[in-house]
């Protein structure tokens, strides 16, 4: 079945403005044609070091929605983000929906892209989740460390997407308080301000998929609108399932079972939370994190995009590497399962 094609047209002067500064976050006007409909949009480049790549990623905004068109340039399979978000959804951690597509800009075929749903207000409305604030972890300062002695703000590393100054102050205070409180007082504080079940499930997802960068950045933190606890949503899971964020093959044990960042450390310092985390991991090893469960999903995604990837003028990997990626992911799952089984005792 052919992938959907999104055709974007940008006026020459606007396109020149876009290309003149790849680091600018300024949007330029454009038109998007999909399914016979022409929609006015705004478009800009997105990403970090990937902006320097020949195949760039884009953020597109309509009057109502925001979409991320990821080039997946460093992932030879082009499916790791999609596979990861589907995995998170299967373990009941709300995650962006995705769809592979072909992007065409001013009649030039840019290749296969992954259209990723933005984690903004419509994301929560669609899922019936009341939300008070939405906060992106945008760099590795978002590691929940005590920053008071460094002179950095406790909000360093974060970007407030929805909310007010009060929400900025609240998160800063949360980061400070987890370092000021100890013992039973800390445990009570965490239970009051953090959805620990959600956090442990998110931790399982990050640890099982092997996303080394997902603990100190590349996540969304949101405050639930009713119970006022913080919850986690994954973001940018290209460096997973046996490869890092640059596409390099890595050992399956790159990410330790205890995960990383100071909040994880604080949570797992309490035995009841370790026991729950261990039970969740054990359950996922028996159910969703298996070759039997994941490989059909891998092959379905891989087969759906294969013909288009072979024609992608900007795919930097050979067809041979692309064709071997399902087996690379299979080997990772087998090895990662053994890693986790060997380390479960560390959670006692």
Residue ranges of each PLM-predicted region?
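Short, flexible loop/turn elements at secondary-structure junctions
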Residues: 12, 47, 64, 71-73, ...
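Soluble non-cytosolic domains of exported or imported proteins
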Residues: 74-82, 161-169, 194, 268-272, ...
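Middle-to-C-terminal accessory/interaction subdomains
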Residues: 179-210, 224-234, 238-348
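Catalytic-loop signature of eukaryotic-like protein kinases
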Residues: 102, 211, 216-224
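Conserved NTP-binding catalytic cores of kinases and kinase-like/nucleotidyltransferase enzymes
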Residues: 1-89
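ATP-binding pocket architecture of kinase catalytic cores
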Residues: 8, 51-58, 66-163
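ATP-dependent phospho-/nucleotidyl transfer catalytic cores
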Residues: 121-208, 284
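Short, solvent-exposed loop/turn and secondary-structure capping segments
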Residues: 19-20, 44, 125-128, 218-219, ...
